[in-house]
Design a protein with these regions (language model features):
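Short, small/polar-rich loop/turn modules that mediate ligand/substrate recognition or access, typified
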Residues: 249, 336-341, 410-412
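Active-site loop immediately N-terminal to the catalytic Tyr-X3-Lys motif
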Residues: 258-261, 309-315, 337, 387, ...
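Substrate-binding pocket helix/loop in short-chain dehydrogenase/reductase
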Residues: 259-260, 264-272, 362, 380
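Active-site helix of classical SDR
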Residues: 283, 320, 328
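Alpha-helical segment proximal to the catalytic Tyr-Lys
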Residues: 288, 333-334, 408
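Residue(s) in the substrate-gating loop at a strand-loop-helix junction
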Residues: 304
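Short C-terminal tail/terminal secondary-structure segment
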Residues: 399, 411-427
Length: 427
């Protein structure tokens, strides 16, 4: 089961975990019976010298395994035959010099565990200042944690959604396909990190996702995908906010249309910087995280019909999109050994809500076809086999398929969402 993590290095936490008697006091037990449901009776306390990071990683894995075994022994000692067995993973992890990591089924519940343990720290400080800190016995703690009425409340929860506990990073998430994808993944329980060069747009999407789906459900990070440092910082913020990354939607967009003789070098470089360099930088950072996490991942590259079919007056854009498709194939080969899947969605003519189509791109494409800009939607509809227009929500459904376990055995694949364009049929 996947959890969302909440990291806390506040002064109160660092002072407590760094104190001489921190382990002794913390392992006495919970500070309040009401906390048990959210924090468990005991935290996981992991000693660390503050220097050996690789050693800490190895020790964390070992200590979590030991904690789970100890929790299962505690349950088996006190449970009745009809009692369920809760998730044995720790809810609170304390590490001297680093702070506290709280966990939960989503960001809100991880935040609840964090806040409750702050209160526990205050209680432990107060008790030890006056005398000593005492808690419930294991039997008493079990009776509270597995109280029948509390167990009944758990049965009233709605079933977990398909992407519950997963974190998705979306580039170009402030508008168009990226925005629609953020909402679709959120509907399935994902936490969203919205990356976009448009800070206000990204913040608006993230704020609306939080309003709709709950506290902590989304984070906005302004990011120029062509900037190596900004990409690395964006992923760092995602990991600090939620504990890791599971899904990456490589979607940042730009477009340019002109005959090759009128395509300036700066135009060519600008398109390739976003669509090739940017997609590479995002993919590289994602792979670094996935390799460290060791639990796989899923990347969806949003290419274009133009990656598969030659087009007039779009040499820079089309060739860059073709490069994205082959990048995805190469990444799929590298990702297989670490459980990472990489797939491609190729949409076409998604005009609604797109920041690209609100620029000169619309006029340039209309000029290429010899029609007025306002005629583009109907022109694109008529040229499709199905005689339909394609909307951002249509593409979001295809992205969800590749991002989720529905496509668990597919990598290196291409899914077109174009209404049927014969020249772009995948062969």
């Amino acid at each position: 089961r996947r959890h969302i993590l909440c990291y806390d290095d506040s002064p109160a936490v660092l002072d407590f975990v760094g104190s001489e008697r921190a382990r002794e006091v913390a392992m006495v037990g919970s500070a309040c019976p009401d906390h048990l449901v959210h924090t468990k009776h005991w935290p996981l306390f992991v000693d660390w010298d503050g220097v050996d990071v690789e050693g800490l990683k190895a020790r964390l894995a070992q200590e979590i395994a030991r904690y789970r075994e100890a929790y299962l022994r505690y349950v088996e000692t006190h449970r009745s035959p009809q009692d369920p067995i809760m998730d044995p993973s720790p809810r609170i992890v304390l590490i001297p010099g680093l702070g506290m990591i709280a966990t939960g089924r989503d960001a809100f519940m991880a935040g609840v565990a964090r806040d409750l343990y702050h209160r526990a720290i205050a209680v432990m400080h107060g008790a030890t200042a006056l005398d000593r800190f005492v808690s419930l016995t294991p039997a008493e703690a079990y009776a509270v944690e597995y109280w029948p009425l509390e167990l009944y409340k758990l049965t009233l929860r709605p079933p977990e959604r398909e992407l519950a506990g997963r974190v998705a990073v979306i580039t170009g998430g402030a508008s168009g396909i990226g925005r629609a994808t953020a909402y679709r993944l959120a509907q399935e329980g994902a936490h969203l990190v919205i990356l976009d060069i448009n800070r206000e747009g990204a913040e608006a999407v993230a704020a609306d996702l939080v309003a709709r789906y709950g506290e902590g459900r989304s984070l906005a990070v302004p990011c120029d995908v062509t900037d190596e440092a900004q990409v690395a910082e964006a992923f760092r913020q995602a990991v600090l906010a939620y504990g890791g990354v599971d899904i990456v939607i490589n979607n940042a967009g730009i477009a340019h249309s002109a005959p090759i003789t009128e395509t300036h070098l700066e135009d060519w470089d600008r398109v390739y910087n976003v669509l090739v360099r940017g997609y590479f930088l995002v993919a590289r950072e994602a792979f670094r995280i996935w390799k460290a996490q060791g639990i796989g991942g899923s990347m969806v590259i949003v290419a274009s019909k133009n990656a598969l079919a030659a087009g007039k007056n779009v040499a820079a854009y089309s060739s860059a999109k073709a490069a994205e498709v082959h990048l995805a194939r190469c990444l799929a080969e590298e990702g297989g050994e670490i459980g990472v899947r990489v797939n491609v969605v190729c949409p076409d003519a998604v005009l609604r809500g797109s920041s690209i189509w609100d620029t000169r791109w619309r006029e340039e494409r209309a000029r290429t076809y010899g029609i007025a800009p306002e005629q583009l939607e109907e022109f694109y509809r008529q040229r499709t086999t199905l005689k339909v227009n394609v909307f951002p929500e249509d593409v979001a459904e295809a992205i969800l398929f590749f991002a989720s376990d529905r496509s668990a055995k597919t990598t290196g694949g291409i899914l077109t969402v174009d209404g049927g364009v014969p020249t772009a049929y995948v062969r």
